[in-house]
Amino acid sequence: MSTLTPAMATMAVALSLFTSLTQAEPRPGQYNNDTAQQSIATYQEAMSYLLGRNGKVKSEEKAAELFQSLAEQNWSSAQQMLGYLYYEGKGVEKNALLAYKWLSLAVRNNPRTAEDIQSRRQQLLSQIPPDSRQQVDQWIAEWQPGS
């Protein structure tokens, strides 16, 4: 099983910044400019904790907490990173259901990421018991920002 390497994290940051500039996460007009800037700063802080850079002591737990707060606000880049953290068990307990949920929400909110995430989602789906698949599909269908 792969791990989140610094190169992967750097690539995710670049993709996330590009996404946020081209797609105005989470939705145009949903937040004012100050809120968007704060969310970008929070994302950058989460990446700093994840990698132990920019004066931050490495803390995957703190990174997961920050990504979680942004993911709940519907930021697809944070949903993607949180899904990866659940997939790898970095900063959170490894959990295929939650990894699949957050990666699926990231794809739903930013279809441009679908190709990058699809193989990992398929791997996760094979790990989820059939009786739990319906539950996770329902979570995804009913999920709303802030829930």
Language model features with spans:
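Terminal, low-structured helical/coil segments at or just beyond the last alpha-helical repeat
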Residues: 27-34, 115-147
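Mid-chain, structured segments of secreted extracytoplasmic proteins
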Residues: 65-109
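Bacterial N-terminal signal peptides
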Residues: 9-18
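Bacterial N-terminal signal peptides that target proteins for export
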Residues: 1-9
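TPR/TPR-like (Sel1-like) alpha-helical repeat modules
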Residues: 93-113, 122, 137-145
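Short coil/turn and helix-start
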Residues: 53-58, 72, 90-94, 112, ...
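Hydrophobic face of amphipathic alpha-helices that form TPR/SEL1-like repeat modules
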Residues: 41-51, 56-57, 66, 81-88, ...
